[in-house]
């Protein structure tokens, strides 16, 4: 049987065929990323065009995409609870992780404590994180948001980078803004401060013991 098509009907047929073909390609791509045979590194997407295409594929499959950003240095239970809550707003959670260079700019020259590669791998091992991308120093606060155009953008109320009113301004790129309070009783900054204090106390004790030992040796000579 020969299918006769002409004019507008022929164009519509090929458009529909292309759409269906793309749909099945998206399914294959998603299985490669999230299926049983996938590995952690397939869920780390640094190429912006690939990230954009992946998000478009997810949305075509009817999935609700959630985006959040942060350093995730010295990951603790507050981070895990925050990411779990963020994931509850949709089907796929994308985490944009600040690079080492960006973290130094934002947090100071002694940060991060944990290097970028390790922070990324820790996040990829968390069950509520689906995709991870790196936010580089040249990226503005809204660059990743504008690229991904998430259905839901999640901010932490503890962030110093953006006020709640400024956060609402990003609604032009996404469907909804959610601002979450801290989900734990500790913070990375507090932990770093405690480690610094403990380190200083230990060093002071060791120096004191060395001085005492040195003075005792002088007295005995």
Model regions: which residues?
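Nucleotidyltransferase catalytic core that binds NTPs
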Residues: 3-6, 13-221
């Amino acid at each position: 049987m020969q299918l006769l098509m002409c004019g507008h009907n022929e164009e519509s047929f090929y458009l529909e065929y292309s759409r269906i073909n793309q749909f099945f390609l998206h399914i294959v791509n998603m299985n490669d990323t999230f299926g049983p045979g996938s590995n952690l590194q397939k869920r780390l997407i640094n190429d912006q065009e690939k990230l954009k295409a992946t998000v478009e594929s997810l949305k075509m499959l009817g999935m609700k995409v959630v985006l959040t950003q942060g350093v995730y240095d010295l990951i603790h239970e507050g981070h895990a609870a925050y990411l779990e809550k963020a994931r509850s707003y949709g089907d796929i959670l994308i985490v944009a992780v600040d690079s080492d260079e960006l973290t130094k700019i934002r947090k100071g020259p002694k940060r991060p404590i944990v290097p970028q590669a390790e922070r990324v791998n820790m996040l990829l091992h968390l069950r509520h994180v689906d995709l991870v991308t790196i936010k580089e120093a040249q990226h503005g606060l809204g660059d990743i948001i504008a690229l991904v155009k998430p259905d839901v953008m999640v901010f932490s109320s503890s962030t110093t980078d953006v006020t709640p009113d400024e956060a609402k301004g990003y609604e032009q790129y996404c469907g909804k803004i959610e601002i979450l309070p801290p989900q734990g009783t500790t913070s990375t900054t507090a932990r770093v401060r405690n480690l610094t204090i403990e380190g200083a106390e230990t060093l002071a004790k060791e120096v004191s013991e060395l001085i005492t030992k040195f003075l005792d040796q002088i007295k005995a000579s």
